[in-house]
């Protein structure tokens, strides 16, 4: 997805120069020697695709295998757009050498300076405890490198999240213990006042460690977890596989790790369960047809089910399929919903009123989205309802957390830089507003961070960890939320002052009615007002109309099904008749062929009969000629005997 820092195409050219391509670096041969062969060839092909375009040069001769391999890598990209080739080039370089951006100062003109966050309306009184127990002045600004802060002179020592007293402003937390390794694309969840961090990506390597932050003492600790692959005790010595882009979901006193990218991906999604009491990972046996392996998906807890949407599979193919895992039976269900959103990954999802699934943002390989999609889990129909307030900017890799009817969105990238605003969406009125904003390249404006919600001493807090914006982060920030009534009034004020962002529907639905349904289902809605009865009557009338229309559609569907069944029966009969006719035709064809063979044999016999007749005729003629000759000879003999008798010649004794 998009990364913060330099905007494209400058980020691409900086990456190309660092890798050894272009005028700012060495030749492509040096790049091939720097990386593994397959990576170097892929970088070469993407660089040529981004700077030259599709490969139109002839294939090199076979005696030059290096040039032939480079040509094959370039030619295999086909007609990939230049922008997509640039982003894939940077993404692959970051996976191979995540620290490249910090080592290219000539392409980073902005100096490292302290970045001042927006000041609150009241004077801050926050003082954080240092790692050694002594007090330190309150930080008023955040440095880009996370090490330089400006302070005030007043000193007050507070404990845990109570140290954060400023509302709606992000505050860096000073934590105890050894911090986890910086990372992004990890998973995070809260179980019993502890924030658990699992996996992630650091320097292009997937992680498998499990860390816990005690939200009471703000102390990090590494969990020495065991992995139980089966029922035998010997399997407990194994380790859980490293992963990134997965989802952590709390369930009771345990939590699940769902999906994620791994070094050796399996064919289907794996669900793992961690028990904090036994510090043991185990593989959950599921039933039904599991989704294909993926990462960057969203997994949302809805009642007693997990709803999974989208992501990117092991072949980097974007997905938009929908699957539901029943946590009581551990059975997967592949759902075919109506009006499915475009494929995406690194988006955020939330559940409202145990009925509606909301999807926001995310991106493809070259584009970031700012669209909001709502899935009615009862009718399984997607829609793009009207939104109010300030329209959010496109982003991917952001994090979200729900507090009541409010959905908070933090961070993400938009192909140019990190997104600095912290947004909140009132899911009852679908109204956007800005809660807080930071400036500069700070961890809060990065991708792959996590955001969790915790209630501590009666106050609601948002806690962020990690992220990547050219640098990997392991910083922890907290934002103390205002009272619910204040936040609702602020949301309504933003809704009245902001502009409406009207989006086209994906399916033929009444979106105003859907918004009213969401408001009706919300526990914190305003149906206790004077116009609640009128709204309820209108909703009932609309519901009756929809039910009547649904009944008509169902009747028509039944009729169509009956007609289809009749047509299929007729088709089956015609198919049988056709098969019978084909059998008869085959028999007739066989008989005709046999007759043709007999006729051919008879013709041959007739031809031989003609020859015999001619031979017989010849013999007859020869016989007639012989008989004629014999007759003539006999006549001559008889005449010669008479003359001989007259002259006294005795007859021939042999004739007698």
From Swiss-Prot:
Domain ACB, residue spans: 8-102
SUPFAM superfamilies found in the cross-reference section: Acyl-CoA binding protein, Kelch motif
Binding site for an acyl-CoA: 44-48, 70
The Kelch repeat ranges on this chain: 194-241, 254-304, 305-354, 356-405, 406-454, 461-507
Region (Disordered): 129-148, 627-656
Pfam families: ACBP (PF00887), ACBP4_C (PF24922), Kelch_KLHDC2_KLHL20_DRC7 (PF24681)
One Gene Ontology term of the molecular function aspect: fatty-acyl-CoA binding
Presence of keyword Coiled coil: yes
InterPro entries: ACBP4-6_C, Acyl-CoA-binding_protein, Acyl-CoA-binding_sf, FERM/acyl-CoA-bd_prot_sf, Kelch-typ_b-propeller
Keyword terms, alphabetized: Coiled coil, Kelch repeat, Lipid-binding, Peroxisome, Repeat
Induction info: Induced by drought stress and wounding.
Gene Ontology biological process: lipid transport
Its job: Binds medium- and long-chain acyl-CoA esters with high affinity. Can interact in vitro with linoleoyl-CoA and linolenoyl-CoA. Binds phosphatidic acid (PA) and phosphatidylcholine (PC) in vitro. May play a role in the biosynthesis of phospholipids. May be involved in lipid degradation via peroxisomal beta-oxydation.
Record's protein name: Acyl-CoA-binding domain-containing protein 6
Provenance organism: Oryza sativa subsp. japonica (Rice)
């Amino acid at each position: 997805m998009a990364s913060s820092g330099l905007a494209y195409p400058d980020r691409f050219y900086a990456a190309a120069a660092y890798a050894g391509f272009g005028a700012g670096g060495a030749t492509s041969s040096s790049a091939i020697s720097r990386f593994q062969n397959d990576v170097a060839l892929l970088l070469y092909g993407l660089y040529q695709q981004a700077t030259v375009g599709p490969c139109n040069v002839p294939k090199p001769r076979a005696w030059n295998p290096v040039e032939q391999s480079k040509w094959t890598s370039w030619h295999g990209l086909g007609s990939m757009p230049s922008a997509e080739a640039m982003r894939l080039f940077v993404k692959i370089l970051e996976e191979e050498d995540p620290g490249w951006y910090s080592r290219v100062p000539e392409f980073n003109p902005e100096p490292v300076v302290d970045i001042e966050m927006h000041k609150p309306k009241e004077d801050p009184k926050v003082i954080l405890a240092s790692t050694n127990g002594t007090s330190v002045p309150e930080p008023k600004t955040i440095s880009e490198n996370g090490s330089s802060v400006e302070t005030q002179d007043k000193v007050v020592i507070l404990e845990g999240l109570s140290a954060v007293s400023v509302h709606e402003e992000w505050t860096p937390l000073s934590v105890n213990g050894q911090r986890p390794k910086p990372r992004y694309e990890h998973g995070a969840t809260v179980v019993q006042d502890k924030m658990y961090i699992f996996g992630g990506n650091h320097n292009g390597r997937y992680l498998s460690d499990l860390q816990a932050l005690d939200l009471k003492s703000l102390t990090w600790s590494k969990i020495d977890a065991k992995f139980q692959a089966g029922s035998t005790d010997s399997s407990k010595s194994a380790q859980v596989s490293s992963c990134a882009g997965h989802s952590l979901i709390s369930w009771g006193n345990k939590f699940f790790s769902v999906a994620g990218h791994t070094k050796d991906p399996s064919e289907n999604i794996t669900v793992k369960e961690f028990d904090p009491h036994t510090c043991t990972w185990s593989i959950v046996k599921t039933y039904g047809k599991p989704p294909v392996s993926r990462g960057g998906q969203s997994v949302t807890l809805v009642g007693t089910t997990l709803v999974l949407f989208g992501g990117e599979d092991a072949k980097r193919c974007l997905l938009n399929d929908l699957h539901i895992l029943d946590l009581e039976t551990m059975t997967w269900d592949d759902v075919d919903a109506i009006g499915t959103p475009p494929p995406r990954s690194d988006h955020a999802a939330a559940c409202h009123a145990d009925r509606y699934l909301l999807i926001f943002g995310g991106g493809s390989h070259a584009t970031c989205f700012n669209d909001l999609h709502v899935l009615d889990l009862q009718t399984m129909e997607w829609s793009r309802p009207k939104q109010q307030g300030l329209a959010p900017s496109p982003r991917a890799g952001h994090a979200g957390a729900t507090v009541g009817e409010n959905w908070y969105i933090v961070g993400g990238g938009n192909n140019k830089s990190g997104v600095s605003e912290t947004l909140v969406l009132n899911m009852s009125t679908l109204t956007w507003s800005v809660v807080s904003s930071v400036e500069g390249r700070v961890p809060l404006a990065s991708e792959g961070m996590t955001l969790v919600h915790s209630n501590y001493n009666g106050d609601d807090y948002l806690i962020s960890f990690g992220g990547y914006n050219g640098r990997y982060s392991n910083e922890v920030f907290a934002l103390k939320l205002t009272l619910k009534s204040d936040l609702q009034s602020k949301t309504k004020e933003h809704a009245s002052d902001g502009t409406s962002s009207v989006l086209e529907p994906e399916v033929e639905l009444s979106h105003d009615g859907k918004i009213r349904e969401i408001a009706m289902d919300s526990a914190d809605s305003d149906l206790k007002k004077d116009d609640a009865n009128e709204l309820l009557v209108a909703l009932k009338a609309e519901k009756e109309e929809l039910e009547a229309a649904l009944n008509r559609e169902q009747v028509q569907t039944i009729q169509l099904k009956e007609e289809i069944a009749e047509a299929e029966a007729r088709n089956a009969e015609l198919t049988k008749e056709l098969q019978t006719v084909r059998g008869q035709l085959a028999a007739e064809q066989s008989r005709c062929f046999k007759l043709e063979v007999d006729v051919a044999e008879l013709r041959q016999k007739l031809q031989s009969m003609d020859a015999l007749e001619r031979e017989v005729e010849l013999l007859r003629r020869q016989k007639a000629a012989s008989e004629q000759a014999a007759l003539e000879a006999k006549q001559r003999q008889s005449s010669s005997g008479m003359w001989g008798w007259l002259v006294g010649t005795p007859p021939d004794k042999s004739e007698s």
